[in-house]
Each structure stands twice: as structure tokens, then as C-alpha cells.
Swiss-Prot record:
Motif window: Nuclear localization signal: 101-105
Cell location: Virion membrane; Host nucleus
Main location: virion
Protein name listed in UniProt: Matrix protein 1
Amino acid sequence: MSLLTEVETYVLSIVPSGPLKAEIAQRLEDVFAGKNTDLEALMEWLKTRPILSPLTKGILGFVFTLTVPSERGLQRRRFVQNALNGNGDPNNMDRAVKLYRKLKREITFHGAKEIALSYSAGALASCMGLIYNRMGAVTTEVAFGLVCATCEQIADSQHRSHRQMVTTTNPLIRHENRMVLASTTAKAMEQMAGSSEQAAEAMEVASQARQMVQAMRTIGTHPSSSAGLKDDLLENLQAYQKRMGVQMQRFK
């Protein structure tokens, strides 16, 4: 796996699924391929994106700044600086300085990532802030190692929280989660269906599913009534794709 592929993988792992994620993935691909060279426009676009947490925006801004060639005097962006200040916690800053001293002696991506993984996400973000604010300089490879370690820490905690929700025995939470998943699957089906004639059936199924979820929420239903809703939708989607000649093995 190439270095940039690895960076893209880690960064996208902390971006919530949805149309915005696909957009960010495209921007990252363009940046890494050298197709997007307007850093200022890129940062302005990033700053105004909804849904993303300030820290995710900060990390993406850091990656764009590392990758896109820019004039030396180009102003640093406040939204990135604020996100990478370790919540203003002096402990994070102390640890970030110690980490920076270690990283300065490192030259490889994997070496830097290994060192950084033993620090908390707050300290890692602060260390990125030091480098972003030009208070310290490391090689691009080392900076990318720091980025990937930070994303791994964040993705780990997101995964723990997601697993807690998936394995919860609370029927109300499970019911709501199934309805949310069915609704987002229906939305994805509508987007994929496009405007071809064969799409009418898929659109109809998706529309009915969304109406059903809406009705279930409006009148309040038994927690078990949502069981299998998303799986039924996915079966319909795969049947539609087969007719269209698309073979997608797994959507679940």
C-alpha cells in the first residue's frame, strides 16, 4: 500500500458516511494526484462543510496544507489552529512538545506512527498544531505518520462507541437504529437509481421504505417491527443491480 493510499484510508475512517464523505474522498484523491493546487479555495470549501467535527476539519486542513504546494507566506487558517490546540489543555501541550522532540529524530512514516500511537488524541492534535503553526518542522512522511496515528486513536473510540450501540440490548435503541439504517439505505438507493427506466422500481421500493419509517415514527410501533427492514431493502437493491448488470457482492 502506498503512503498516500494509507493516509487517505486513515483520514476517511474518521469521516461520517454520507454524500460528504464521497466528496471528501474525491478531494483527497485530487490533492494526492496533484490535480488540485488551489490551497486557499480548498480550505475555504473545507471550512464551510457541515456535519464534520472541528477536529476532523483540522486534520483534513493539516493534510491539505502538507500536500498542496503553496506560497511560503500563505496565512494559516484559524479554524485549523483552533481545532489543533488540544482543547487548550496545558498537559496536552507538554506532551505534544515531548512527542515533537521524538518525531524530529524520526525519518520514516511507520516509525513516526509507532511513536505517536502511545500518546492520547489530544496530545497528537496539539503536536499537529505545533507543526501547522510552523513552530516545529518535521518531514512530510513523519507528519503523515502523526496524522494516521491520530485518526487511528479517534477511529478506535468511534468503533467502541458504535459497538456499544450495536450490541445494546435496549430494544428502543435497536429499533431506532434499524429505522435510521433503513432510511439511509433508501436514500442511497434513490441516489444510485438515477433516471433510467429500470430505476423506477428501485425508486418505488426506496420511497415506500422511507414512508414506512416515517409512519412508524409518527404513530410509534413495537420495537420488533423494524426487524429485517434494512436487509429487505438491500435485497431489493442487489436484485435491481443484477438487472442493471452490476455485480456488487456486499452492501451489508
